[in-house]
């Protein structure tokens, strides 16, 4: 009888351990859905292989400490002179293309996420769009201020759009609280 109880106790302990090990995944807030140019974009987990286009979007990612999840940046040296601080934050993250990335540039890095905008890494009718990348299971967060290039009813660039994109990026990567604190700090500096 004691052997039977011991086996059942062991099974119960293993079952409880399995249940509790799943709690961090639930507590992290996934799945999450954000708006990307009027389209819902859902993540069941934070991206692990992100590519970010343009210096400003890269700086947003760096501010959230996303470097460990980044496999590339694009559109830096072809348009800008990177500061020593930017280069330090970029670290060993390679630049995949100095200006606009090609589909081949991106696929070679095997990303699961691309943060770019219309006329900021993507061109209407080009090879790199949310639709073309979606065929390769690459989710694209479109910079909100660029949505006006594909939908004239969308709002023009504003600080609120920038704040919203930072909050979306934080939510996607499981860093919503950190993003909220950054946005609050930005708002205080601008006020």
Region locations from a protein language model:
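Bacterial Sec-exported substrate-binding components of ABC uptake systems
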Residues: 2-4, 16, 20-60, 171-191
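Sec-dependent signal peptide recognition
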Residues: 7-15
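Extracytoplasmic
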Residues: 29, 36-38, 45-48, 52, ...
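Extracytoplasmic substrate-binding proteins
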Residues: 30-33, 40, 129-191
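N-terminal hydrophobic signal/anchor transmembrane helix of membrane proteins
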Residues: 49-67, 149, 159-168
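A short, structured surface patch at a secondary-structure boundary
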Residues: 52-109, 113-121
